[in-house]
Amino acid sequence: MALPILLDCDPGHDDAIAIVLALASPELDVKAITSSAGNQTPEKTLRNVLRMLTLLNRTDIPVASGAVKPLMRNLIIADNVHGESGLDGPALPEPAFAPQNCTAVELMAKTLRESEEPVTIVSTGPQTNVALLLNSHPELHSKIARIVIMGGAMGLGNWTPAAEFNIYVDPEAAEIVFQSGIPVVMAGLDVTHKAQIHVEDTERFRAIGNPVSTIVAELLDFFLEYHKDEKWGFVGAPLHDPCTIAWLLKPELFTTVERWVGVETQGKYTQGMTVVDYYYLTGNKPNATVMVDVDRQGFVDLLADRLKFYA
């Protein structure tokens, strides 16, 4: 039986590819998709979810728009990474359907209530919507199997020296998620920076030759340009968000550790930092499965294999 998942995202090139991977995988049953502000403004990330589902002929999936700003802060977006639309590069179709007439939290709660088995929440943007769900519906915590997030890092940040972008945007929300008591799986920069897509991988995807694989290649063409900056020291572009879906499909591709994670919300230099108690110094029980390594070639092969689904 397929694993029921709720996808909360802020597309974003890598979010879009995570959607493509999830919907090409019969092991997963995507019950609903909610959008969050992050990589772009809330209007644009919602539109990008609708555009991607229109491209994939999955207008049957319920979509709802989430919070327009973080819990306690002003919104920061990553338009320098993802462009004016949030999905600059390919020519994507206009949305062929409308979102649900409800909020993201309402759609999430409805989905959890109606599911016969616990649902896995996959969150590839700031954690605002998930935190609002957890705070407003404690009675539904038991309906959540786990929360798989792309965010954080044990080591260096990518938005500040200490913080990864998704967590930095709304650290208070991320702290609510990590301390919720619900199992959390963290795909942080320690693993996503190893899940790099090289130019030859992009050409491999393009050569598959179907409309979706072509769009994915064009998304990566744009995404690779930003990551050519020498400061990163990358060979390709880190494909952050699809690591969450890939872990659900093939956990054997990833090396993980069980550790306690907290989020710094006050620090002068460290706001948004995920503090991973790697050496068990706090005495706190582990609250997260933290990804630390990936079989890069296996990850690329999985993407290439699933892109053939759209032939």
UniProtKB/Swiss-Prot annotation:
Pfam families: IU_nuc_hydro (PF01156). GO terms for molecular function: purine nucleosidase activity; uridine nucleosidase activity. It is an enzyme of class 3 (hydrolase). GO terms for biological process: nucleobase-containing small molecule interconversion; purine nucleoside catabolic process; pyrimidine nucleobase metabolic process. It comes from the Bacteria. Gene3D superfamilies: Ribonucleoside hydrolase-like. Keywords: Glycosidase, Hydrolase. The active site is at 240. InterPro entries: I/U_nuclsd_hydro_CS, Inosine/uridine_hydrolase_dom, IUNH, Pyrim_hydro_RihA, Ribo_hydro-like. GO terms for cellular component: cytosol. Its EC number is 3.2.-.-. Hydrolyzes with equal efficiency cytidine or uridine to ribose and cytosine or uracil, respectively. Belongs to the IUNH family. RihA subfamily. This is Pyrimidine-specific ribonucleoside hydrolase RihA. It comes from Escherichia coli O127:H6 (strain E2348/69 / EPEC). The lineage of its organism: Bacteria, Pseudomonadati, Pseudomonadota, Gammaproteobacteria, Enterobacterales. The gene is rihA.
